[in-house]
């Protein structure tokens, strides 16, 4: 018996959704409904973000200019829509963040990854 995957929307995503242009908001909501109904759908093309600190961060196409950043687990069944932005900004956002499990509470936490200083 396999359980239905769980889909979550991050606080960052929810706080920033209203700041997106209205035309983009409607595309994001349409995509989010598809994502929520089946995050394993073949119509969702998860793309690797090569410079990402977290290999579970994936890019998804909202339209030609806008990308969603999604946590797609290697194993497990919890998917999270984390962020939406224009292509390059979305990738930069993903490159600087990592989703971890808090060892005390067991909750998912987003951390910002510091760039190592070049000496």
What are the language-model segments listed below?
Residues 34-60:
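A short, surface-exposed loop/turn module that caps and links secondary-structure elements
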Residues 2-20, 24-27, 31, 46:
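N-terminal "first-domain core" detector
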């Amino acid at each position: 018996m396999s359980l239905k995957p769980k889909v979550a929307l991050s606080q960052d995503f929810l706080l920033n959704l209203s700041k997106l242009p209205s035309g983009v908001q409607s595309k994001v909501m349409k995509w989010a409904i598809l994502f929520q109904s089946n995050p394993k759908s073949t119509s969702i093309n998860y793309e690797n973000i090569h410079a990402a600190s977290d290999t579970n961060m994936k890019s998804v196409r909202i339209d030609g200019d806008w990308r969603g950043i999604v946590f797609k687990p290697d194993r497990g069944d919890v998917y999270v829509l984390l962020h939406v932005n224009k292509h390059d900004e979305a990738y930069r956002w993903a490159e600087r963040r990592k989703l971890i499990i808090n060892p005390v509470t067991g909750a998912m936490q987003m951390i910002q990854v510091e760039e190592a200083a070049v000496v």
